[in-house]
Amino acid sequence: MEKTMEKIVALAKARGFVYPGSEIYGGLANTWDYGNLGVELKNNVKKAWWTKFIQQNPYNVGVDCAILMNPQTWVASGHLGSFSDPLMDCKECRERFRADKIIEDYATEKNLTLEGSVDAWSHEEMSAYIEKNNIPCPTCGKHNFTDIRQFNLMFKTFQGVTEDAKNTVYLRPETAQGIFVNFKNVQRTSRKKIPFGIGQVGKSFRNEITPGNFTFRTREFEQMELEFFCEPDTDLEWFAYWKQFCIDWLQTLGIKEDEMRVRDHEKEELSFYSKATSDIEFLFPFGWGELWGIADRTDYDLTQHQNVSKEDLSYFDDEKGQRYIPYVIEPSLGADRVTLAFLCAAYDEEEIAEGDVRTVLHFHPAIAPVKIGVLPLSKKLSENAEKIYTDLSKYYNCEFDDRGNIGKRYRRQDEIGTPFCITYDFDSETDGAVTVRDRDTMEQERIKIEDLKAYFEKKFEF
């Protein structure tokens, strides 16, 4: 069975995971809406992150910061000055491209090895490589490009009724800066001592020139970010700790070792303020793609905001009698990307018998959009089956389905990744028990109706 993006996208659209945005108006490029199953899947992924990184973690607390911030925030963070992509236009067809992506795609196609990360190359080095290899335009095939120039990725808008420079604001390109500007507030009100972390889940916006690969790279996206504040001399220990914590989280939820890899950034790739950066990548059907960036950002962010705002963002360690700017370890995860990764990892086609193939999504029960399908064997049994549905839906997202052949109903639940199906049959009327079917093994066992809640509590532990 070949796992392709075409199959996964088709299933996602057909079953209500993801729809094209604004579809009845012809759509809007690179926008996607999460459907009835997609919103449950993504919410479960976010909940699983929040549970392990915030709720169950003694170090960390959460915030939810505004999307619009004082523009000085982006001066301090460097986004207004340097948050940009190297772009060039084809003079023949007038299409615009990222120079680094053209080089990377060409090298992949020709099976060539590049020296270091293209991100670290200068404009001159990129231009020289494109000229030397006579790389053609991906759209028209000609080789006639403009010079490379930088393009800022921030979405600009205006606050209030007047569209002038004084009212200019930006849609945040990351959630992290809201955490940094609230460092003192959170530390004071939570009474946390270093080391501690602040986490946030929220929307961010980047005016990407080459978005694509379904929901992998979009202009509007959701992030799950943690900023972990620590003593300057302990940063590399915490960097290693959080890197392993992130790997464990992914593997616990079903990402296999051979589907992921950790890529440590070379020295020349690192941002000037970073001591270490690692990317956790997932093997999508279209190739390796970054899910999680873990960075040792040193004291850069708090120092920058302290310098621009003139507010003291240092921390006084009363046990050591020292005052310092904390270092920051940042594990930054894309909610849309990791949701897509879980969807790709879960997708499978199994040959049950000759010519009989079932499509199944092997989601971890904690993130499955529907936890339990309640399926009465006959419509005559629907009333009592609905009572089971009503009781269990207080605790889990359940689906009730009494239409059609029971075998076809099982297959539909397999396709949407439902871990367990309850079949209420004619024997249930007399013995007070139901058949519970396991999605992955397709094995069935008889469980007393009164024991179902306790039975599923064990199954859905995370």
Curated annotation (Swiss-Prot):
Transmembrane segments: none annotated. It catalyses: tRNA(Gly) + glycine + ATP = glycyl-tRNA(Gly) + AMP + diphosphate. Pfam families: HGTP_anticodon, tRNA-synt_2b. Substrate binds at R98, E174, F221, E222, Q223, M224, E225, E330, P331, S332, L333, G334. One of its GO terms (molecular function) is transferase activity. One of its GO terms (biological process) is glycyl-tRNA aminoacylation. It comes from the Bacteria. Keywords: Aminoacyl-tRNA synthetase, ATP-binding, Cytoplasm, Ligase, Nucleotide-binding, Protein biosynthesis. It is an enzyme of class 6 (ligase). Its EC number is 6.1.1.14. One of its GO terms (cellular component) is cytoplasm. ATP binds at residues 206-208, 216-221, 290-291, 334-337. Its main location: cytoplasm. Gene3D superfamilies: Anticodon-binding domain (3.40.50.800), Bira Bifunctional Protein, Domain 2 (3.30.930.10). It is found in: Cytoplasm. Belongs to the class-II aminoacyl-tRNA synthetase family. Catalyzes the attachment of glycine to tRNA(Gly). Homodimer. This is Glycine--tRNA ligase. It comes from Lachnoclostridium phytofermentans (strain ATCC 700394 / DSM 18823 / ISDg).
